[in-house]
Amino acid sequence: MEARERGSMSSSIGNSAELEGNLTLSDRLKVFKGSTFDPDAYVTSKCQRMNEKETRHLSSYLVELKKASAEEMRKSVYANYAAFIRTSKEISALEGQLLSMRNLLSAQAALVHGLADGVHISSLCADDADDLRDEDLYDMDNKQLSNIENWVVEFFDRLEVLLAEKRVEESMAALEEGRRVAVEAHEKRTLSPTTLLSLNNAIKEKRQELADQLAEAISQPSTRGGELRSAVLSLKKLGDGSRAHTLLLRSYERRLQANIQSLRASNTSYGVAFAAALSQLVFSTIAQAASDSQAVVGEDPAYTSELVTWAVKQAESFALLLKRHTLASSAAAGSLRVTAECVQLCASHCSSLESRGLALSPVLLKHFRPGVEQALTGNLKRIEQSSAALAASDDWSLSYTPTGSRASSTTPTAPHLKLSISAQRFNSMVQEFLEDAGPLDEALQLDGIALDGVLQVFNSYVDLLINALPGSAENEENPVHRIVKVAETESQQTALLVNALLLADELIPRSASRILPQGTSQSTPRRGSSDRQNRPEQREWKKKLQRSVDRLRDSFCRQHALELIFTEEGEVRLSSEIYILMDETTEEPEWFPSPIFQELFAKLTRIAMIVSDMFVGRERFATILLMRLTETVILWISDDQSFWEEMETGDKPLGPLGLQQFYLDMEFVMIFASQGRYLSRNLHQVIKNIIARAVEAVSATGLDPYSTLPEEEWFAEVAQIAIKMLMGKGNFGGHGERDVTSPSVSSAKSYTSN
């Protein structure tokens, strides 16, 4: 019971890849969004009966889900960022208008209260006015007014001088002093409302004058470094932080544009060096702007949003410039290495900004991806064309891969592997392609485009190998589809299989390991490597490579089977007449396997010797090849309707002698396939079914087939003698107890003598 529950749990966890394929990200995240979600209970329910492997699997699934969620959130933020910034600016503008309105209302309220207090004081003092002498009152008021007026006059004179001399710090201190005096005058009512309002307006005008002066200084190209930061900070202290931040970013933008113009003027070519210098210039400028922004305005969300918008704009301009001058030309020429180096440099510089909260990779991805895909397509097309040209002159002889090329130095071929000329070149081109495409796939998140392209060109190369087989259906239907040198001999034809197998089974996966999902490397521990090798994406990609090899193997088997079954003129050699006509003779036949099955045995023996030399360390593939070739011939007999119609319902049905010969032929196939260790269960069952059908055909004529057929040991003994004869290890005189001669003995003697 416990084992069944554990298996159920493992199955549910193991289907995470299936869930990813059937559910959207939002659906998979619903379980975590509920108000009743309990993390501890969720983890406990998943891990209660899980072993170590299942726990690692769940952990890996949750990590991938976390990454997918973060990426989805990032895409959503960037997709709606412009609207968010636009709304944020509108809200900020509205807040500013509300603040101005509040200040205006406060000033008006102060004026009204001041007027009301003045009227009230006048009414209270009306009765005592006669007690004061007019000249004394005038002297007292004049003394107070003269003191304040003198201070105001001196204040504005001093402020004018400070502004004219552009002494920013002292000007700001003076403005602060004036503000403080105005506040005290308002609180102590030492100034009339009209005078106080005039003083405030004058201070506001001077403050605006200083702000304009600072803005002009910030806009000057010569203002840089500490002077720039100081001016921006001063403008922010004056209450115009939004303007200060905008001017700071504009200053960096003007400086960046000027530096880009100088860089373009000093470069005669727009290659990797230009891309590296341009990338360094742009992203270092963005980094410096971000640093100054944080130093001046801090982490205020409003300013951070403006910085992000500005950085995205600069990154887009940079991407378009690099795309127009470098990537477009290299992509059109199919120069994947130049494209890869440029993109890798840009991605490296871009990633350095992520620590500052600026993730600009999606911007580069949007603009670089079309050009990169064009470069990938151009390289893949070049690989196809070069492979086809080499296949036209390949003699299909195997040799060790030469060393010294860029591909062989980075991904060395195992010394025991031999390939033909076209396969060697195909392998080196694929290695170079994947070496260049690896950084692109990682930087631009190409979702396996490079691997799909490799699979495509490998399928095309396998098509070339299929066309190299004699009598290939592709060549017959479309002779000009591919001009390929035909593999005439069995060794050459087997070499075609070696090319495909070694490429699909070892060389291409080794080259692709750097960009396969969590690809393995030689430095990783064995256990981790094994876990990654079992990833569904990697296994599925390798299965697709193997299916192409299977296509070639099936074509190989079909071609050799057709050589046995049909003559060059297209006539059928393996027909029912071989067995039906045996009962028309009056003499006892000399029992021996039919010539066509002798040829099948000889062909399989030759191919077995060839594959034993060529498929060293890959005996399983060699066994499957021999198994499939034998099955192809036997299945043709099983499925040929005309063969069975003549045997079962023809004018001359199958007789006992023909049945015995047919039985012997099938037993012969089973024995030599069993001895060669390529007798599959399927082949064994098909042969048994064929024999049973032939026996039923004889029974349908009213004869008892078992009364004429020898014992099974007889068939096995004759088949064994035939095998020895055909291999040159026996002779007919060595078995005198039975007459095992047949009409086919002469062909056997001819075969062994040759």
UniProtKB/Swiss-Prot annotation:
Keyword Transport (UniProt): yes
Xref: InterPro entries: Cullin_repeat-like_dom_sf, Exo84, Exo84_C, Exo84_C_1, Exo84_C_2
Ranges of compositional bias, category Polar residues: 518-527, 741-754
Pfam families to which the protein is assigned, alphabetical: Exo84_C, VPS51_Exo84_N
Region Disordered, annotated ranges: 514-540, 734-754
One Gene Ontology cellular component: exocyst
Biased composition range(s): Basic and acidic residues: 528-540
Keywords: Exocytosis, Transport
GO biological process, one term: exocytosis
Transmembrane segments: none
Gene3D superfamilies named among the record's database cross-references: Exo84p, C-terminal helical domain (1.20.58.1220), Exo84p, N-terminal helical domain (1.20.58.1210)
Protein family according to the UniProt entry: Belongs to the EXO84 family.
PANTHER family (alphabetical): EXOCYST COMPLEX COMPONENT 8 (PTHR21426), EXOCYST COMPLEX COMPONENT EXO84A (PTHR21426:SF15)
Assembly and binders: The exocyst complex is composed of SEC3, SEC5, SEC6, SEC8, SEC10, EXO70A1 and EXO84.
Functional note: Component of the exocyst complex involved in the docking of exocytic vesicles with fusion sites on the plasma membrane during regulated or polarized secretion. Involved in polarized cell growth and organ morphogenesis. During cytokinesis, involved in cell plate initiation, cell plate maturation and formation of new primary cell wall.
Protein name: Exocyst complex component EXO84A
Species, as recorded: Arabidopsis thaliana
